[in-house]
């Protein structure tokens, strides 16, 4: 620890004392991996139609990789709202998501309903996820989606104290309902296309999950169809930048 106003500098072992040190919601470089590559960002055409397809509850040991491959087949990117506990299980996948230019966002640490938590538990859900992401890829999420969409003023204030923008969705495919259905992949595909085309048909945020086989299979089919109709698959941040889609407050 150093402070330019101090005449005498002191050194504190952060790893041994991390439970007693507040870092103003920021991690320290020594906790980040040193081999992280710069992300491969996509080129966005502001004049073309866009949809931001978001994937909750990962990373998954195999399906997250498959989802990334699906987006990249069409020069697209996704936004992955990941659980901190899963980031700790699969840090290499988190790192890959970041390096390949997809967006990593927070879905809290263990998918708790935040409106039912006290202030301390709420803070832990946010903080531990930020730390898990930083440890895996050297950066922290700037977007967060509350599990179940559950929010109130206390939850929103906690998000903003970490500099996090809350993102919900325009279309919920309810893909989890079809995870064990024989024709589930086709239903998910149809729902993704429906939600991408709803309202003005340009600039929607669509919700699926990258932890179900049928969801990712449905994603693959939907991307193929939507790409033929001129859609770009962009991150939430790019959607906000180019289409003016505001965060949800």
List the predicted regions and their residue ranges.
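Terminal accessory/targeting
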Residues: 1-51, 69-78, 202-249
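Active-site beta->alpha N-cap acidic-glycine motif
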Residues: 20, 24-117, 121-141, 225, ...
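Active-site-proximal beta-strand/loop segments in catalytic clefts of secreted hydrolases
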Residues: 55-58, 81-85, 108-109, 145-149, ...
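Residue-level detector of anion-binding/catalytic polar loops
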Residues: 77, 103, 165, 172, ...
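Noncatalytic linker/hinge segments flanking ATPase motor cores
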Residues: 94-98, 120-125, 143-151, 183-190, ...
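Residue-level recognition of the N-termini of beta-strands and the immediately preceding loop/turn
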Residues: 140-142, 203-204
